[in-house]
Amino acid sequence: MSGLSESAKLVKEALEQRGLETPMRPNAVSREEKKEKIEHHMREILTLLQLDLTDDSLEETPHRIAKMYVDEIFSGLDYSNFPKITVIENKMNVSEMVRVKDITVTSTCEHHLVTIDGKAAVAYIPRGKIIGLSKINRIVRFFAQRPQVQERMTQQILVALQTLLESDDVAVTIDATHYCVKSRGVMDATSETTTTALGGIFKSNPATRAEFLHGLR
C-alpha cells in the first residue's frame, strides 16, 4: 500500500479486518492501461449488440465509458483517490451530536452495473477528535464511487469514520432507489431501500438513536 495516505491505509486495513472491503483483486495495470483495455472490450460488447460504432454518435462511446469507469464512477476502487482528511483535536470540548444529512449518494449496483441514487445521513458524537464537515461528504462519495451493495456501503462509511475519529459513536443511514429494481426486473419505480449502521452509543442508547433518526424527518 505504498503511496497511500495514512488515512487511506488505516481505513482499508480496518475494512479488511472486518470483512467489509469490496471484493477486489490487486493488479499492476496502470490507469491508462485500464482505460485502453476497457475501451477495447467495450467496443467488442457494443459491436456484438449490433451497434454501428462508425456512427458519429457512437464512435467515441467505448472511450467515454472507459474514462467514466476509471476516472469517475469506479474511482473509489483506488485508495490513492481516498480524500485528504482533516481530523483535529476537540479543543472546544464539543459533546453534542454532529449530524450531516441529505448527502447525495450516486453509486452503481455491483450485480447489474446500473445506478443507485439516494441520500445519506451521518452523525457522530465528538470525543477526542472532530472532523471537517466536508470530509464526511467526501468519504460518502468515495465509497459510492465503486460497484456496491447498499448494505456494505453503509457499513464501510461507518467503519471509515469510526477509524478516523477513533470512536465507535457513529451512525449512518442511506435511503436509495435502485435502478436494477426500477428499470429492469420487477420495474418498481417508487420503492426505496433504507439501510442503517449504528455504532457505540447510537446502538446502545435508545434515546441517542431516536435523536439521530428523528432529526432525519
Curated annotation (Swiss-Prot):
Alphabetized UniProt keyword annotations: GTP-binding, Hydrolase, Metal-binding, Nucleotide-binding, One-carbon metabolism, Zinc
Family annotation (InterPro entries): GTP-CH-I_C/QueF, GTP-CH-I_N, GTP_CycHdrlase_I, GTP_CycHdrlase_I_CS, GTP_CycHdrlase_I_dom
GO CC annotation: cytoplasm
EC number in record: 3.5.4.16
Domain of life of the organism encoding this protein: Bacteria
RNA-binding found in the keyword field: no
Catalytic activity: GTP + H2O = 7,8-dihydroneopterin 3'-triphosphate + formate + H(+)
Pfam family, one: GTP_cyclohydroI
GO MF terms held by the record: GTP binding; GTP cyclohydrolase I activity; zinc ion binding
UniProt key word Nucleotide-binding: yes
The protein's enzyme class: hydrolase
GO BP annotations listed: one-carbon metabolic process; tetrahydrobiopterin biosynthetic process; tetrahydrofolate biosynthetic process
Pathway it works in: Cofactor biosynthesis; 7,8-dihydroneopterin triphosphate biosynthesis; 7,8-dihydroneopterin triphosphate from GTP: step 1/1
Binding site for Zn(2+): 109, 112, 180
Quaternary organization: Toroid-shaped homodecamer, composed of two pentamers of five dimers.
Family statement: Belongs to the GTP cyclohydrolase I family.
The protein's name: GTP cyclohydrolase 1
Organism: Vibrio parahaemolyticus serotype O3:K6 (strain RIMD 2210633)
Name of the encoding gene: folE
